[in-house]
Design a protein with these regions (language model features):
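Membrane-proximal intracellular helices of multi-pass ion channels
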Residues: 1-340
Length: 340
C-alpha cells in the first residue's frame, strides 16, 4: 500500500482508494475523448470501413494515453495526417504528465482555483514539460529543416508535423519510426537527452522524470548563487527530495553509460547510435537507429533489461530513499573537503 501511495503521488494511505478511482476515471475519460476525436480521421483513412475504424480508434486511444508506442499494422501515425496524428499527440502528452498533475488540475478546475494555487509538483511538471517540448520543436526545425533525407521535395507542412512528433513522442511514446535514422547526429544526441529526462512522475512515461531534472537544475542554480535553500515558485524544496533527485539521476546516468559502452563493444556501433538506443530503451521512447538486430541477440537482451530497469528503476530508487529511516545514533563532526 505504501508503494502504491508513492506511485500515485499521495502521502496518505487512506486516500489510495479515492485516488485510484480518479485515476481510472481520468484514464477512461481521456481515452474516450481520444476515441471520438480519432474516428473521423481514421474513417477517411480506412475509406469508410466502419468496423476497422472502430477497432483502430479504440486501439490508438488506449495505446496513446498509455504511451505504448506501437500499432497493429505498423502504419505508425499515418504520417502527415493531422486528423489522426493530433489526437494521438494530445493524448500521449496527457499521459506523460502523471496522475498527481491531472488530479490537481481537475480539482483546481472544479474548485475554480487559479494557476498560482496549483501544487508545486504541478507547476514544476508543467513548466519543465512545456520548456522541453518547445526546445525540442525549435531544435528539430533549426537542425533538420534542410535535411534532404527526410524532406526531399517536401513543403512546410511535413517539416512542422515531424517537428511536433519529435517534440512530444520521443520522451516515451514512440510511434512513427521511419524517419528517425535519417536525422543528424546532433539531433540524435539532443533526443537522447530528452528521452533520458522522460515524462512526469507517476506517469506512463519513463526516464528520470521531469521533476527530477527540474530539481537538479534548481540545485545547480542555488549552488551558483550561494543560496542554502532550493526554492521554486515561492516554495522551498525539501532536502530529501533533492537527495532523491541526485541519487536517481546519478544511478541512471551510470546505467546509461555502462549500457552504451557495452553496445559499442558488442555491435561496433558509434557512440551516438549506442547512446540513442540506450536512452530510448531506458526512457521507454520506442525509437531505434538499428544498433541491435537479430544478428546480435546479446545487444537485444541488454536493451530489454534496460527497458525493464527504466520502468522500475527510478521508482524503486526513489521509494528506497524516501521511506522512513531510523535516526542515526551517532552524528559525526563536519570536515571540509575540496570539490570541483
Amino acid at each position: 500500500r505504501m508503494l502504491t501511495a508513492n506511485e500515485l503521488g499521495t502521502t496518505k494511505l487512506g486516500e489510495i482508494k479515492g485516488v485510484l478511482t480518479v485515476v481510472i476515471t481520468t484514464a477512461f475519460v481521456i481515452e474516450g475523448i481520444t476515441f471520438v476525436a480519432l474516428f473521423p480521421g481514421l474513417y477517411k483513412v480506412n475509406h469508410g470501413n466502419v468496423r476497422h475504424t472502430l477497432w483502430e480508434s479504440l486501439f490508438f486511444a488506449v495505446m496513446a494515453y498509455n504511451n505504448a508506442g506501437f500499432t497493429p499494422d505498423g502504419a505508425g501515425l499515418h504520417v502527415n495526417n493531422w486528423a489522426v496524428g493530433l489526437p494521438i499527440l494530445a493524448s500521449a502528452f496527457c499521459g506523460t504528465l502523471g496522475f498527481p498533475v491531472l488530479l490537481n488540475l481537475m480539482r483546481s478546475w472544479r474548485m475554480r482555483r487559479p494557476p498560482k494555487r496549483w501544487s508545486l509538483h504541478t507547476k514544476l511538471t508543467l513548466t519543465t514539460t512545456f520548456c522541453i517540448v518547445i526546445a525540442s520543436f525549435t531544435w528539430f526545425l533549426l537542425m533538420e529543416w534542410n535535411n534532404k533525407l527526410l524532406f526531399a521535395g517536401d513543403g512546410i507542412e511535413p517539416r512542422l508535423w515531424h517537428a511536433m512528433v519529435a517534440a512530444v513522442m520521443p520522451r516515451s511514446s514512440g510511434f512513427d519510426l521511419s524517419w528517425m535514422p535519417g536525422v543528424s547526429d546532433a539531433t540524435k544526441v539532443f533526443l537522447s537527452i530528452v528521452m533520458f529526462i522522460g515524462g512526469g512522475s507517476t506517469s506512463t512515461a519513463g526516464g528520470i522524470r521531469v521533476t527530477t531534472f527540474a530539481v537538479i537544475l534548481l540545485t545547480c542554480r542555488a549552488a551558483f548563487t550561494g543560496r542554502h535553500d532550493i526554492n521554486a515558485f515561492h516554495r522551498r524544496i525539501h532536502t530529501q527530495a533533492v537527495m532523491t533527485a541526485v541519487a536517481v539521476s546519478t544511478a541512471c546516468l551510470m546505467l546509461v553509460t555502462v549500457v552504451s559502452m557495452a553496445l559499442m563493444i558488442i555491435t561496433d556501433c558509434s557512440l551516438c547510435d549506442a547512446l540513442f538506443d540506450t536512452c530510448s530503451a531506458f526512457g521507454l521512447g520506442g525509437y531505434s537507429v538499428g544498433v541491435a538486430s537479430e544478428s546480435s541477440p546479446t545487444a537485444l537482451y541488454i536493451l530489454a533489461a534496460t527497458m525493464f530497469i527504466g520502468r522500475l528503476g527510478p521508482l524503486t530508487i526513489a521509494y528506497a530513499i524516501s521511506r522512513p529511516h531510523n535516526l542515526e545514533a551517532v552524528r559525526y563532526p563536519t570536515e571540509q573537503i575540496v570539490v570541483g
